[in-house]
Curated annotation (Swiss-Prot):
It comes from the Viruses. A lipid is attached at C670, C672 (S-palmitoyl cysteine). This is Envelope glycoprotein. Residues 337-373, 404-461 are annotated as: Disordered. Residues 33-185 are annotated as: Receptor binding. Residues 672-676 are cytoplasmic. Filoviruses entry requires functional lipid rafts at the host cell surface. Essential for infectivity, as it is the sole viral protein expressed at the virion surface. One of its GO terms (biological process) is symbiont-mediated-mediated suppression of host tetherin activity. The mucin-like region seems to be involved in the cytotoxic function. This region is also involved in binding to human CLEC10A. The coiled coil regions play a role in oligomerization and fusion activity. It comes from Sudan ebolavirus (strain Human/Uganda/Gulu/2000) (SEBOV). Keywords: Clathrin-mediated endocytosis of virus by host, Cleavage on pair of basic residues, Coiled coil, Disulfide bond, Fusion of virus membrane with host endosomal membrane, Fusion of virus membrane with host membrane, Glycoprotein, Host cell membrane, Host membrane, Host-virus interaction, Inhibition of host innate immune response by virus, Inhibition of host tetherin by virus, Lipoprotein, Membrane, Palmitate, Secreted, Signal, Transmembrane, Transmembrane helix, Viral attachment to host cell, Viral attachment to host entry receptor, Viral envelope protein, Viral immunoevasion, Viral penetration into host cytoplasm, Virion, Virus endocytosis by host, Virus entry into host cell.
């Protein structure tokens, strides 16, 4: 009783203390502890770089699960490299996690592997598991392998992303992408009486009529899948293959496929024809495409740069078994052909162009055998391409090729249109400047120019180009599909329309700032990346590491954007300064010449009263501000020697809460004392 008597308070003081306790409790409810997450759509780039904490997690409804692709971190996406990241294990049950949104995938995979005895290596997909919905290229591989295990897992512990479902195992015959699962904290929406609640889509639902995209399929055959030494063959048609022995890009395979069809280097028997790539051939064209070829637009695989050479002919003992016969060959690289030999030496002053009456249909990228191109769009997109197919006297003949992607997939067994006799001449794919140069008058040295004649007008559609290319739906629509950096992430998770952005063509393999998101229609905006749940077959840290790679890619993209903006502003400042200087000099010169008539203003009147103001200091200050706030600021310290009291401000709400709890306990003891 002696101890309790010390806690007794007068009735008026008790009321004041109780009121103070309730105020503290309500204050703690209203101001929760921050979780260290980037905040709303109005954040600045410096806030992202410094990871400023401004938002609070009030409820679990603010969390949104997002699938992040590993290719955004710069991993190799070709089939030989990707298969080395997958392995079979037994005794580990698969895990499936649902997520709500995800990135656009540049490369997806589809596997159908059998054991030597003919049984399936991979399990069938469970009910509700559908293919990844946004794939630019689908690498469809068939083959055999030992498959030493029940399931195929990711060796690094990553997920295999399907349609709104992420699994730790590969399922048979379903498109998937490699990735991890992260969570975004969304800004809490403000609810009003006049605003209806948002309509949420089902978790496993991806239909979005506003998104148009093209998916291309590349087919492979793999021998000894899952083993240390395996063989991968790229399928041109049912009997023609290319052995892949180095990292490559899908763009290289597409160019190679068209070149083999163009040179008619297909198997002309029922046996197999396997081509091997020479070591000098560059297989990295179009790296980091992400819906656009941004590495080097002039770096293409042209037909005249390759030569085909037969190596050996291996036949079985039974000559009648033609189907088992294998012919081998090599695709070599040779010097680039000069286009000057296309112009005749004894040509007149003008080389006219005309379109021949008979069109020659060449195997285009959408009509070749061995792959299918499916376009999921409600529109029909047509493009006419022009290609020089040979010379005829003093005229260059151009054959128009119509490319019309349709919503249905072109079967791989479709026959190739037989070329006309004109197509037997050496075929050359030329770039725009090379072809247009032939329209100018050309006179051989040492010869007198002949009489000038008018060239016939070349009437072609406006969209005629000089190279056959795949027409993507997003190239013909005003609303693009590419979103990048933080603005793209925040906008793509909301209801705003996305716009396409041209990115740097010199992006290295370690930095890929192009993150493209597909998502259900939500009214929320993404606030930032918070944390990743720990799932997987047991590789520690893979998910956190994967998220940090993607976050670093965002920071890398922002820094790269700031560098480019600063350089552009500096060039613009230099140009405007020089232009202002030249303008003032010219004005003085004109005034000097017109001084006998009273000068320029006496002649022009009030129209000459224009002063080229000097804004150099303003632009320089803005450039220095960008450099100071964004480029020169170092990244947060990644060392592990952080002081335990570094974030002491974050302990203030916790201290207030603990103090409130202690006071509440004391108040309850006082109440009990009074009642007793």
């Amino acid at each position: 009783m002696g101890g309790l008597s010390l806690l007794q308070l007068p009735r008026d003081k008790f009321r004041k203390s109780s009121f103070f306790v309730w105020v503290i409790i309500l204050f703690q409810k209203a101001f929760s502890m921050p979780l260290g997450v980037v905040t709303n759509s109005t954040l600045e780039v410096t806030e992202i770089d410094q990871l400023v904490c401004k938002d609070h997690l009030a409820s679990t409804d603010q969390l949104k699960s997002v699938g992040l692709n590993l290719e955004g971190s710069g991993v190799s996406t070709d089939i030989p490299s990707a298969t080395k990241r997958w392995g079979f294990r037994s005794g580990v049950p698969p895990k499936v996690v649902s997520y709500e949104a995800g990135e656009w995938a540049e490369n997806c995979y589809n596997l159908e592997i059998k054991k030597p005895d003919g049984s399936e290596c991979l399990p069938p997909p469970p009910d509700g598991v559908r293919g990844f919905p946004r794939c630019r290229y689908v690498h469809k591989a068939q083959g055999t392998g030992p498959c030493p295990g029940d399931y195929a897992f990711h060796k690094d512990g990553a997920f295999f992303l399907y349609d709104r479902l992420a699994s730790t195992v590969i399922y048979r015959g379903v498109n998937f992408a490699e990735g991890v699962i992260a969570f975004l904290i969304l800004a809490k929406p403000k609810e009003t009486f006049l605003q209806s609640p948002p309509i949420r889509e089902a978790v496993n639902y991806t239909e979005n009529t506003s998104s148009y995209y093209a998916t291309s399929y590349l087919e492979y055959e793999i021998e000894n899948f899952g083993a240390q030494h395996s063989t991968t063959l790229f399928k041109i048609d049912n009997n023609t293959f290319v052995r892949l022995d180095r990292p490559h890009t899908p763009q290289f395979l597409f160019q190679l496929n068209d070149t083999i069809h163009l040179h008619q280097q297909l198997s002309n028997t029922t046996g197999r024809l396997i081509w091997t790539l020479d070591a000098n051939i560059n297989a990295d064209i179009g790296e980091w495409a992400f819906w656009e070829n941004k590495k080097n637009l002039s770096e293409q695989l042209r037909g005249e740069e390759l030569s085909f050479e037969a190596l050996s002919l291996n036949e079985t003992e039974d000559d009648d078994a033609a189907s088992s016969r294998i012919t081998k060959g090599r695709i070599s690289d040779r010097a680039t052909r000069k286009y000057s030999d296309l112009v005749p030496k004894n040509s007149p002053g003008m080389v006219p162009l005309h379109i021949p009456e008979g069109e020659t249909t060449l195997p285009s990228q959408n009509s070749t055998e061995g792959r299918r191109v499916g376009v999921n769009t409600q529109e029909t997109i047509t493009e006419t391409a022009a290609t020089i197919i040979g010379t005829n006297g003093n005229h260059m003949q151009i054959s128009t090729i119509g490319i019309r992607p349709s919503s249905s997939q072109i079967p791989s067994s479709s026959p190739t249109t037989a070329p006309s006799p004109e197509a037997q001449t050496p075929t050359t794919h030329t770039s725009g400047p090379s072809v247009m140069a032939t329209e100018e008058p050309t006179t051989p040295p040492g010869s007198s120019p002949g009489p000038t004649t008018e060239a016939p007008t070349l009437t072609t559609p406006e969209n005629i180009t000089t190279a056959v290319k795949t027409v993507l739906p997003q190239e013909s629509t005003s609303n693009g599909l590419i979103t990048s950096t933080v603005t793209g992430i925040l906008g793509s998770l909301g209801l705003r329309k996305r716009s396409r952005r041209q990115t740097n063509t010199k992006a290295t393999g370690k930095c890929n700032p192009n993150l493209h998101y597909w998502t259900a229609q939500e009214q929320h905006n993404a606030a930032g990346i918070a944390w990743i749940p720990y799932f997987g077959p047991g590789a520690e840290g893979i998910y956190t590491e994967g998220l940090m790679h993607n976050q670093n890619a965002l920071v890398c993209g922002l820094r790269q954007l700031a560098n480019e903006t600063t350089q552009a502003l500096q060039l613009f400042l230099r140009a405007t300064t020089e232009l202002r200087t030249y303008t003032i000099l010219n004005r003085k010169a004109i005034d000097f010449l017109l001084r006998r008539w009273g000068g320029t203003c006496r002649i022009l009147g009030p129209d000459c009263c224009i002063e080229p103001h000097d804004w150099t200091k303003n632009i320089t200050d803005k450039i220095n501000q960008i450099i100071h706030d964004f480029i020169d600021n170092p990244l947060p310290n990644q060392d592990n020697d952080d002081n335990w009291w570094t974030g002491w401000r974050q302990w203030i709400p916790a201290g207030i809460g603990i103090t409130g709890i202690i006071i509440a306990i004391i108040a309850l003891l006082c109440v009990c004392k009074l009642l007793c």
